[in-house]
Amino acid sequence: MAVEALHCGLNPRGIDHPAHAEGIKLQIEGEGVESQSIKNKNFQKVPDQKGTPKRLQAEAETAKSATVKLSKPVALWTQQDVCKWLKKHCPNQYQIYSESFKQHDITGRALLRLTDKKLERMGIAQENLRQHILQQVLQLKVREEVRNLQLLTQGTLLLPDGWMEGEMRRKSTLLLGQTGVRENLLLFLRRISFIENSIQI
């Protein structure tokens, strides 16, 4: 099973944040100033003209890959969101699962807390089906942790209602200082390591 990895660079002053400003050049760790694409003989420099379509497209793609889409955290998923997830990740048994999940009011928070015994009580009798669901839930937990880690490295973390007082009790955005980011980053790295180890059965 493949698990996506995330690399975060730490320096003595704090975390290296992804740069979004135009004109800033990033150096890839482990390589000199020249990256593999520059060393490639077929590489052609695009003239540094403002408005060049190829350059603008490349910058847009770089910005997209460096930022995290602020989607709704799994803990805030409704039953409908969980059913969409089930349909995507368990299409063969979707009808059976969706009915059982609706009857037991499984939201995102409950999905993250599912166990083998809970699934058995919900009427999913076959052990291999329960294990498949739990495997998908573990992968979801890893993706959620990676997402949170990426948000932390960007200095922004979206918190669910009730965790932090906000205007009209909506989702709040917490901006973390460098020391807070480093401490939370280490905590998330430990959690991801634990989850990855538990996936490798």
From Swiss-Prot:
GO BP of this protein: cell surface receptor protein tyrosine kinase signaling pathway
Q: Where is the SAM domain?
A: 77-143
User: One Pfam family for this entry, by name?
Assistant: SAM_2
CDD domains, alphabetized: SAM_aveugle-like (cd09510)
Lineage, top-rank taxon, reads: Eukaryota
Q: Which GO terms describe its cellular component?
A: cytoplasmic side of plasma membrane
Q: What is this protein called?
A: Sterile alpha motif domain-containing protein 12
Native organism is Pongo abelii (Sumatran orangutan)
